């Protein structure tokens, strides 16, 4: 079996590591293995290796569609927000609009909160439907719109469409706090004991459309993570303040991040 053969390879090197003449340097045997192994062998080998610091977790991209929907339609759990999503396209702004920004008018299932819905024109409002009023077909399509469930979907769909569709949902810190706990619960079932995830405390929207301060968001996270169901998971969780390194104001944001981390 592939798994057994790889374990034997690792064990044999570990047992005789004291004898350099009997065990080739790691760089040699790994290079040979990498060049000669089948894709299946490489997959199993990397799957079994302990994972290092190069791996990281983005909270915003770690949540199931069902979790997003569940929280979107429950104001009593999401902080009193109501969400609308685009179910039809009426080209309210005509032809020739910028379809490469974060809010293209041709993007189905772009989700907005009620404060932003109220700023739309009547034509634009006609494209959107309250999320808890979606019919079964629309709900299923919305759930699938933030899954990679088709053969032609991949990296571009994930990075260029999913985030734009989630939109205001991803800016609600109360939903974000619930998602942290949902991840802790799900990972606990798989035996995980430590979770370190990236999330930004900045640019989070209140239900009236105003913006939370970073410290206000961190306080919301603290309050949620001290509740019994979070503690009961047994998962130690730490949060990293994320930074988009290629944004025009990356250096200023980095300074802001350090100030926030220092004060907390």
Region spans (language model):
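Bacterial N-terminal signal peptides that target proteins for export
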Residues: 1-10
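N-terminal signal peptide c-region/cleavage motif recognized by signal peptidases
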Residues: 16-20
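Hydrophobic helical h-region of N-terminal Sec-dependent signal peptides
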Residues: 11-15
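Metal-cofactor-binding active-site regions of metalloenzymes
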Residues: 23-264
């Amino acid at each position: 079996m592939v798994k057994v053969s790889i374990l034997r390879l690792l064990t044999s090197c570990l047992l005789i590591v004291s004898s350099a003449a009997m065990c080739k340097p790691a760089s040699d045997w790994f290079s040979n293995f990498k060049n000669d192994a089948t894709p299946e062998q490489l997959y199993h080998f990397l799957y079994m290796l302990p994972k290092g610091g190069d791996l990281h977790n983005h909270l915003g991209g770690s949540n199931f569609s069902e979790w997003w929907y569940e929280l979107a339609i429950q104001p009593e759990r999401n902080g009193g927000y109501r969400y609308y999503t685009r179910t039809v396209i009426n080209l309210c702004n005509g032809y020739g609009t910028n379809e490469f920004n974060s809010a293209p008018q041709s993007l189905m299932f772009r989700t907005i909160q009620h404060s932003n819905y109220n700023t739309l024109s009547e034509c634009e409002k006609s494209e959107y439907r309250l999320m808890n009023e979606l019919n079964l077909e629309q709900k299923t399509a919305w759930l699938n719109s933030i899954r990679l469930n088709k053969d032609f979907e991949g990296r571009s769909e994930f990075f260029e469409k999913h985030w734009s569709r989630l939109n205001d949902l991803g800016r609600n810190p109360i939903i974000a706090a619930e998602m942290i706990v949902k991840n802790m619960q799900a990972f606990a079932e798989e035996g995980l004991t430590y979770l370190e995830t990236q999330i930004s405390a900045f640019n989070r929207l209140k239900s009236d459309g105003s913006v939370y301060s970073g410290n206000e968001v961190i306080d919301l996270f603290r309050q949620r993570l001290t509740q019994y169901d979070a503690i009961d998971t047994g998962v130690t969780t730490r949060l990293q303040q994320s930074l988009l390194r290629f944004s025009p104001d990356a250096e200023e944001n980095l300074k802001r991040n350090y100030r926030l981390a220092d004060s907390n």
